């Protein structure tokens, strides 16, 4: 397990007042204790270990900014992705900061904020290997995926249909290594992670992308609507002032469009059309800067 990093955030009275309407109960109302959350610290560029110690990445910056706007301290722990949801349910974590793909199944088990990034699925192959131009090209291949991720679910659901095998790994870095070593023909990961892997590893390259229409969002326990709504308010404000878009440009090298999840603000709280979505029109309360 990676070392825990605590970010001390100075409380600002204006922000506290701005969030007062949504901080009514649960962990988010306990101002004396830091928010506790976790990430897969091998899931670059969303979260990764710095050489000098500590964590960095898109989701680390997102978590720091979220805590700042809530006037809270935050503890971000690095662990395997498969341990994050059990940790949330055991109340080890107040929410999951790691990218969690929102699916109908997951929306029945957790409360989500609105999405902060769109997530498509991209294959990574060894450089020089034949490109994957359609899902039919997966026949006879072995796909490496991160255990407990949406990519494992996708490969499990589609392996028989497209006649491929899949292996699961404790983290995505090991899945990419399986491609580099020839133990797997391709790795399936989110589009941002796949692009980063190819950028950092000249021996691999990206290929076919599966369009999903899915988003990444912050995950909370079903009984913590107050926490979800507090974080949701802050996230909406971060979209409105361009913070999420700037973080995407910093870490992924692209500027999200007007309809991208990093920019578009939902009318209610949660992911529209799925369980847990609150259709009540929600006007974010943002502190003046």
Regions found by a protein language model. Give the residues of each.
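Immediate post-signal peptide segment of exported/extracytoplasmic ligand-binding proteins
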Residues: 27-55, 130-132, 136-142, 271-289
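A conserved helix-loop-strand patch within extracytoplasmic ligand-binding domains
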Residues: 72, 100-102, 114-164
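Beta->alpha turn/N-cap motifs
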Residues: 38-43, 77-82, 91-103, 119, ...
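Extracytoplasmic small-molecule ligand-binding "clamshell" domains
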Residues: 30-99
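Periplasmic-binding protein-like
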Residues: 41, 117-125, 195-235, 254-276, ...
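Short helix-initiation/N-cap motifs at beta->coil->alpha
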Residues: 60, 75-86, 130, 166-181, ...
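Extended ligand-binding regions for polar small-molecule ligands
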Residues: 60-69, 129, 136, 142, ...
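A ligand-binding cleft/hinge motif common to bilobed small-molecule-binding domains
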Residues: 83-86, 98-108, 156-157, 178-212
């Amino acid at each position: 397990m990676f070392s825990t990093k605590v970010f001390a955030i100075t409380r600002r009275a204006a922000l506290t007042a701005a969030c007062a309407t949504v901080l009514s109960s649960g962990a988010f109302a306990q101002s004396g204790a830091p928010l506790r959350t976790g990430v897969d610290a091998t899931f670059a560029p969303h979260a990764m270990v710095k050489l000098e110690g500590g964590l960095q990445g898109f989701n680390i910056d997102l978590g720091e900014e979220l805590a700042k706007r809530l006037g809270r301290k935050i503890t971000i722990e690095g662990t395997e992705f498969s341990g994050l949801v059990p940790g949330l349910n055991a109340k080890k974590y107040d929410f999951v900061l790691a990218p969690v793909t929102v699916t109908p199944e997951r929306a029945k088990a957790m409360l989500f904020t609105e999405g902060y990034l769109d997530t498509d699925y991209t294959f990574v192959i060894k450089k020089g290997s034949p490109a994957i131009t359609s899902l039919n090209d997966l026949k006879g291949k072995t796909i490496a995926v991160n255990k407990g991720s949406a990519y494992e679910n996708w490969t499990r659901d589609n392996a028989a249909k497209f006649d491929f095998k899949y292996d699961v790994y404790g983290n995505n870095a090991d899945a990419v290594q399986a491609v580099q070593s020839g133990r797997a023909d391709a790795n399936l990961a989110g589009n941002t992670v796949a692009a980063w892997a190819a950028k950092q590893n000249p021996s691999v390259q990206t290929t076919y992308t599966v369009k999903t229409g899915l988003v990444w969002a912050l995950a909370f326990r079903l009984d913590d609507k107050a926490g979800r709504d507090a974080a949701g308010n802050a996230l909406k404000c971060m979209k409105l002032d361009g913070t999420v878009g700037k973080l995407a440009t910093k870490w992924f090298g692209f500027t999200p469009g007007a309809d991208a999840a990093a920019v578009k603000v939902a009318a209610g709280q949660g992911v529209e059309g799925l369980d847990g979505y609150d259709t009540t029109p929600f006007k974010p309360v943002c502190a003046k800067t």
